[in-house]
């Protein structure tokens, strides 16, 4: 199973049902909606299509809303384009004007208060660089030297590297977009241009007011955000390393080390991290990635990222499906080369000690030492699965949760395969349900060794405190099956009706010699029936058929060989009984 998750930006090139199906089958785990572009109506249509296709394919796909953020842009230029020439001067005005080679304006009127003489102003992702020469606050104008020649079009981005900018945490548009996302039940918010913890708290306040359970991933895109990363992470659920604007705001040569540091900090806290921007940029135009791009994706995985993201490659590129397949193949190859024993050792040293982490690290070490097939995490909130994931075990992590929201939010967590299954109230029922669900995924089968981890008592969030090593059971008896289907339950041996009186039979398989009239009312309440009585026309077989209860008859010594409270799998189609949960699907 591929462990690194893939986030795909959905746009004109990928919004059709046909292409979304291809992306999901190719490996997309999370769909990103970029609210810098498009109306609510357009995004609503995309959300509906994504959910329709995901449901048809029975795939868990998370939805990520990426805010436009409090960015600075230029206003419009005369004829849509001007040329700024190196060596000349240009005025940046705080008052809106039609841009010319001599003067243009920006959307942020307080820029004049934030910059100083000598500050740099970068235009259009740094393609044109200006240096502040004079500041005239009376006129609201900043005179700059043009350091290199370049074109400037309408509404291009403006960056102020090294300048503390007093922009609001979120704009009115962001707030409207977030409320739209709440209404549409999105799973993640990627908050653009986060500089300080208060920016995240502004979003969290809206979520709390609306009682929305949406995880927040601040996008670190500037030096101020990097400087405040510890405090930002304290109030965040994850992080996006957005290298596009970051590479403009800080020197490009600093980006790789900043990326490693940000990912490491997230790994230490067990918070998911997405590495984004220009990962396979050339695949917008070409069907094959460059060698440098392949190395970039692989190195992000070696750094410890949970997810890698495609932007223009899937939103507007010519080869969206090929881009996802390429990213998937790079991830699988990179993961195969990992030294998971060393990785676990490094993570054990990195992560702080706590009760929950103690269970997590024990699970990971046990999984490695016993070479278990899978780790099955029964989880309400996703906390158990994230706790295991932070130690990067080689074994598959199967997160069994009753919450569709939790499942989608686990879709971005490294190594976690989320499955939605109705919750169980007792510990035994929870464990049985977890094993049964793991088998249903096809990743666990008869005879496999697995680890089950959960929090008990059940139903309480954030209480991971239990680990169980479990061997998926073997065949213990054989007879003649009646009906079809299979059930898993605890055996209850009955010589007569009195043995069943007053018992809860809702998860029980009745084991008896034969069925008479006194037993029928109890058989109706059970989930399965095993009898020593032989024959397809026997009373036991007839009752099983009439009541639609999976039944196996003609099992010799059933009442002696099968013990009370033993967990058994009854497979009516094959006439077999297994101890524990067996793969009979």
UniProtKB/Swiss-Prot annotation:
K(+) binds at residues 34, 36, 66-67. Keywords: ATP-binding, Glycolysis, Kinase, Magnesium, Metal-binding, Nucleotide-binding, Potassium, Pyruvate, Transferase. Gene3D superfamilies: Phosphoenolpyruvate-binding domains (3.20.20.60), Phosphohistidine domain (3.50.30.10), PK beta-barrel domain-like (2.40.33.10), Pyruvate kinase, C-terminal domain (3.40.1380.20). InterPro entries: PEP-util_enz_mobile_dom (IPR008279), Phosphohistidine_dom_sf (IPR036637), Pyr_Knase (IPR001697), Pyrv/PenolPyrv_kinase-like_dom (IPR015813), Pyrv_kinase-like_dom_sf (IPR040442), Pyrv_Knase-like_insert_dom_sf (IPR011037), Pyrv_Knase_brl (IPR015793), Pyrv_Knase_C (IPR015795). It catalyses: pyruvate + ATP = phosphoenolpyruvate + ADP + H(+). SUPFAM superfamilies: Phosphoenolpyruvate/pyruvate domain, Phosphohistidine domain, PK beta-barrel domain-like, PK C-terminal domain-like. ATP binds at residues 34-37, 73, 156. It is an enzyme of class 2 (transferase). This is Pyruvate kinase. It comes from Staphylococcus epidermidis (strain ATCC 35984 / DSM 28319 / BCRC 17069 / CCUG 31568 / BM 3577 / RP62A).
